[in-house]
Each structure stands twice: as structure tokens, then as C-alpha cells.
Amino acid sequence: MKNDSRLRKYVPSLLLLLLFEAVAVTLWFTKDNLFYLLNFSYIGGCMALGTALFTAGKRYARHFVQLAVGGYMLLYLGVISRENMQIEGFWYYLFLGTFEAATIHYAVAKIFGPLLFGRGWCGYACWTAMALDFLPYKRPQKPRREKLGVLRYVMFALSLALVTGLFLMKVAYLEQIMFWLFLAGNALYYLAGIALAFAFKDNRAFCKYLCPVAVFLKPMRYFSLLRVHCDESKCVHCVKCCLLYTSPSPRDAHE
């Protein structure tokens, strides 16, 4: 019985692996490209292993997944394969009318996937957060400034306007431009992320105030099957969650 209960806690990791394998096989056959099988099998395997290690209490689990998945997407898909996996790349492929690269990535990780695993992308796979999580402010030391959250919508609108403008002006060598935008965009994200982390004494300040991807993730997480909820009937009002997330109440800390 003890073995059964121990194994049961790894079911979410197994389901996550099966989900990615289903996506991998489906895209392999529909797109007739072996890359999708290898790509999503690798990502799903890393995610499943990382969440299983996290469940087992291994402190390095999340960093392992971030480096394995985030590093792969940044260096191999982004730099070596020259695919813009940022939000500008999503708009680019969307306007081209093709379901590949960034459009597939966004559909799986940031638009429909969060209905199952919430903001798992932010915690386990984002290559920006991968670097920011090594900074010294793992626990926010200042209250969250809710009004600054509007900046993420500004970033979202600017990225859309930028790519729309490039298409409307029929700029030549657009594919090469998107690659350089990927490099420049990531450099700016890292610089802004580090600056905000030290300014607000919070590693994830960039995620809270500037990240445009949150515009997709924020509404989806409310319907997530794996969303963390506050069970008020079991709350002992220790306020640890409030201190950790600098929130005024336990309910707000888990929202």
C-alpha cells in the first residue's frame, strides 16, 4: 500500500509525458517531419523527469528542467536553427499563415497547454526565467506593484505593432530580420530582467511587470486543471504564503 501511495504522486509527471508524446506523434504524422517527434519527446521527457524529481523533494529539479528545456530552445532552436521563438516570431508565423515553429510552440506551451498545466512554462521552461532564477532574490522583498502590470500589455502591443509594420511595409529579408530581432529581444529581456530584479529585489519582477507572454498565460491559468488553490478551510493563518509572495491575504497569494 505504501508503494502504491508513493507511486501515485508521480501520476501528474506521467500524464505530462503522455501529453507531450501525444503532441509529438500527432505532429510527426500530420507534418510528416521526424523533428517534431524528437523535439516534443525530448521536452516532454525533461519536463516529466523534472517534475518527478521535484515531487521527490530534489531541490535542483526545477533548475535542471529550466536548463535542459530552456537552454535547448534558446540555443538550438533559436540560435542554431535560427527560429524566432519569442512573441515576435509567433506573430510572424501567424501572419504567414503557417502552423510551425513559434506558432506550434505558443499553441502548446502558452495558449492551450496552460489549460492543463497552468503557468508551468514560467516555472520550468522559460529561458528568460532560467537565468533570472539564479539571481539572489528568490523571495520577493518588496510588495508587488499591481499598477505596473499594465506594462506587459504595452509590450504585447508593441511586439504586435512591430511585426505588423514590417509586413505592411513589405520589408525585404524579413526572415533574417526576425532572427536578429530574436537575438536583440533576448538581450533586452535579460538586461531588463536583471535590472528589475535588483531594483525591486525580486528575481521575477520582469515576469510580473514586463513579460508580454503573460497576456496569454494570465487568463488561461484560471481554468487550469493543475492550478494551485487556497483551501481556506485548512488555512491556519500562518501568513507564510503572504510573506513569500508579498500578498495581503492567503487568497491573493494563490491567485
Residues covered by each model-derived region:
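Non-ligating segments of multi-cofactor redox enzymes
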Residues: M1-L243, R251
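Single conserved hydrophobic/aromatic residue that forms the stacking wall/gate
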Residues: P248-E255
